[in-house]
Structure formats: structure tokens, C-alpha cells
């Protein structure tokens, strides 16, 4: 696919691809990991931020992208054991931290929390905040945490059936197939709108042939938010989250990166 070609080209020109407002450090060598994201996740005790006082380094590849604005000021890093969301706090991250880039995360001095079931790292949130952690507050702070290599490779999602999803997959890039749209918060049924009028923004609910369901969440600011959802059976790719569907029942949700994360089944 064209995106794989773009990723290969990025691996060649990465050094010069950022703009003057966003100059991350990069290196041909980055620190080795001394633990895994899975192990870090096991150590985290939910419902409170955890301070990392010791030297903790994890390595992985970026699986998210803000290129189409469905992700905002964060990156997801996956080391093939688990995934973690870095609260970067900068814009247009896909230019400097593209999908498939190998990075090392120096987590000493950071706080670890959780949001929508996904492990997060950043600075400690204010006491009045409803979140565990907040965005890193400067370019310098970001450069301390994220060490960027020049190694970019295509990312391949994990193919799963809905019935096989569990909490170990939270934060990871999944592809779920045989999905049919059954509900969307984007339509007003009282006004006579139907699923033929549904667009991506908000929540949409899908079922497979076995009747298992999964939700898709799309930000209103995503570039494809107002594009019509295909009504054929689909394969959908995205980062797995867990939270309230349309403010009600909690369930697994996918958050797509690009509109092309939706493909015919």
C-alpha cells in the first residue's frame, strides 16, 4: 500500500522532516530497554498516579498518528508486549514521530496513570483534574522522555475476533473484521435520519456475524469526522480502548488513526 511506501521514505529523510517549531532530538543509537511495557503495566496500581523514581527505559514503535486529527498531542508506543500512551503535549506529531518510528522512553521522573484502560505517561496532573497524568509541559521535557531513532518500519495490526479481545490488548493496534454498522450517535432518528446518513463523528456500534459488538469513537475534529460511514461489511483498524459507550455502558472501543483504517471486508 501507499502508506508502506511513505513509511519507507520517512526512514530515509526523517532527520530533516521536522519544522522549526518542533525540533526533537534524534540519534542513530537509542538506549536499550531495561524492562517491558507489559511489566510496567503489571506494576501500575489503578486509580492513582504512580511516580517512577528509578531508571526505567522501554523501547517500542509508534502505532498512532495525528495526521488526520483523531489523535491529539499524544503518541502510542508498542513494544510487542503491551502499549503505552505518551502525553507529549505538542501538535503535528506525525511529522516528527511518524507511525513505525522506533523510540526509547526514559520514564524516570514521570508519572504513570491510565485513561480509557490505556497506560499513560506524562507529568502529574493537577489535584483538581479528573485525569491521572497531564501533558509534558515543554519541548525540553519531551526530549528527556522520548529518544528518537532513525529506524522506521511498517506497522502491522493484530488481527482478532471480538470474542478474543481482552484487557491485555488495551492500547494496542487491532484489526477487527466482519463488522456491520448497527447504530450511530451522529444521526437524529426523530428527524427521520437513518444509518444511510451516519458519519464517523461520535460513537458508532458494529456487530459481527456472531452478534458480538464493538464501538468506534471518532473525535469531532478528525478530518474524516463528517464523512459517511460505509454500510457494507467492514474491517476496522484502531487503538483499543475501554470506556463508556455514549456515556452509558462500558465496552471495548477502537479509535481509528486514518479514514483508510476502514476497509471493505
Region spans (language model):
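Bacterial N-terminal signal peptides that target proteins for export
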Residues: 1-7
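Short helix-onset patch at the extreme N-terminus, typifying the N->h transition
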Residues: 7-8, 23
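C-terminal motif of bacterial Sec signal peptides marking the signal peptidase cleavage site
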Residues: 14-16
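OB-fold nucleic-acid-binding modules
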Residues: 18-104, 108-265
